[in-house]
Amino acid sequence: MRSSLLRVAVPCVLLLPALRAAGQVGSITGKVDATPPKYLEETVVYLKDAKPAAPRTLALDQKALKFQPKILVVAKGDTVKFLNHDTVAHNVYSPDGEAYNLGTFKPQEERTHTFDQVGPYTQLCSIHPERLAFVFVAPSPHAAAVDAQGRYTIKDVPPGSYKLAVWNSHLKAPDKPVTVEAGKAATADFSLKR
């Protein structure tokens, strides 16, 4: 299964720089508002039906007793390096999806995990239970976390019609259809509610 996925994904990834240079990709921008606004920054906007890409490696760091960033957006098949640039040992685990526990690791050590299921993964530390972050696994790399004002941009989207979805740690909004044209930015806003 993974090899057939790679046969489809690798050509798409190899074509993306050429499409980008020729102005043959578009983007999606928008704003998300939330009622209540408390959890707005725990929001990801993503394409549900975009084609997958070749796996990447991204990083989630630990500094000053915090996960950085608080939300890391990855695609199905990506590997995350969990770094420890703190002065104390940490443990990283998630009870969600394909639950995992990476064990305890000292400062300057790292662990990795490859995500094969789409969805949110709460990141916790058994040594410091007040710490919290999320890894959101999207079906493709066409996804983005919102900023503090709820704005987002999904770049390098091949032209086509898609289903745009939003995930939030506590709130919901219905999916929206979106059409992306080459060299243009499509716009889609969301209102999150309980």
Regions found by a protein language model. Name each.
Residues 9-20:
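Bacterial N-terminal signal peptides
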Residues 22-194:
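Extracytoplasmic copper-binding redox domains, predominantly the cupredoxin/blue-copper superfamily
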